[in-house]
Amino acid sequence: MRVLIKNGTVVNADGQAKQDLLIESGIVRQLGNNISPQLPYEEIDATGCYVFPGGVDVHTHFNIDVGIARSCDDFFTGTRAAACGGTTTIIDHMGFGPNGCRLRHQLEVYRGYAAHKAVIDYSFHGVIQHINHAILDEIPMMVEEGLSSFKLYLTYQYKLNDDEVLQALRRLHESGALTTVHPENDAAIASKRAEFIAAGLTAPRYHALSRPLECEAEAIARMINLAQIAGNAPLYIVHLSNGLGLDYLRLARANHQPVWVETCPQYLLLDERSYDTEDGMKFILSPPLRNVREQDKLWCGISDGAIDVVATDHCTFSMAQRLQISKGDFSRCPNGLPGVENRMQLLFSSGVMTGRITPERFVELTSAMPARLFGLWPQKGLLAPGSDGDVVIIDPRQSQQIQHRHLHDNADYSPWEGFTCQGAIVRTLSRGETIFCDGTFTGKAGRGRFLRRKPFVPPVL
């Protein structure tokens, strides 16, 4: 199968050019002008449009069971939504398994979830929920099998203490893996939450007040120091929501420490006032939404290069689940927001079209740097001969208002309802196959492939 994309502006992280793009058998074969492929081929006219590498979302939670509820997106509905939003690869954060389970247990469970369902290519981050000799011995074998990143938690049921974190950092570093971490100070959060509950203060606003930015920033600073103690182990901070944490990361990077950080559209575009609305419970996520001042600090990091990746932390629970389980108490509400379908459009509209970032920086944040950090480059995140034919075409002339009824996940609401975006996803191709076109999903369940990722190699800081 041959596909020729003509008359568009092809953009990579290192530059852009008005040129044509030829995909053959799922692989990019040629870029240039006046390409004359062998017949037969499909021709796509991208006049006036940007032709970007397909998005790489390295933070999703499909099929996750958090004990009190299971997310309403599985690997079909979740990856369908991703495809319709221009994302062609996801790396899913596996949820916790049974107490005492091995790393391989969760990998087998999640491969079972995704097989025959995923629409786009996918991989997983391992999750380390406890430390013992068997787990430490298992890590190198998992890296050899293509899992080159693992997540630690400093909060929730399977939080690790400092000694366990150090053991994990050392072994992951030795094994060629990248440590990712959810950084929040669990003890401080528990104390604040208990105070509010004892006082009968259980409205959504108290979720944010029980998890102040200092809880997140302290944990970020602690992880940076522990990574240094562990032999300058590489570290990736997920879902950054505040400027103080970013300051600590800037300092670490100035000291040549290998640290990277992601943020999410919700921390750039939503703020804590959402908790005071009638539907405040729909915005319960951790870390919580912050104030507009923190948004501005994150946008500075997006613009000046201090933030490396924009992912989603897509974790969907319906409003029915939230209301039934929480009964008006923030501490009982399952955490997470949908957003895998909106990431690319929101960042393009609020970043590129406002002049905050260039189209090249857009590629770096949404596909190139995620692919490089997580062992997928240059197969993903790049449009060059030999790379996968993963493409998203965005028309900057079109304006769209986000409406839940037009989205493709399995949620019953969207936190982005009513947002007007300048720029529309008009087509998504995965390995040369059109899986979304002009508002219609055209992919098939099970066509996505499991990606064995390469060991971690740090990009140049």
From Swiss-Prot:
Positions bearing N6-carboxylysine: 151
Binding positions (a divalent metal cation 1): 59, 61, 151, 313
Pfam hit, one: Amidohydro_1
Enzyme class: hydrolase
EC number: 3.5.2.-
GO cellular component: cytosol
SUPFAM superfamilies: Composite domain of metallo-dependent hydrolases, Metallo-dependent hydrolases
Binding site for substrate: 156, 286, 335
Gene3D superfamilies: Metal-dependent hydrolases, Urease, subunit C, domain 1
UniProt GO molecular function: hydrolase activity, acting on carbon-nitrogen (but not peptide) bonds, in cyclic amides; metal ion binding
Binding positions (a divalent metal cation 2): 151, 182, 239
GO BP annotations, alphabetical order: pyrimidine nucleobase catabolic process
Similarity-based family: Belongs to the metallo-dependent hydrolases superfamily. Hydantoinase/dihydropyrimidinase family.
Cited NCBIfam families: D-hydantoinase
Subunit comment: Homotetramer.
Name the record gives this protein: D-phenylhydantoinase
Organism the protein comes from: Escherichia coli O139:H28 (strain E24377A / ETEC)
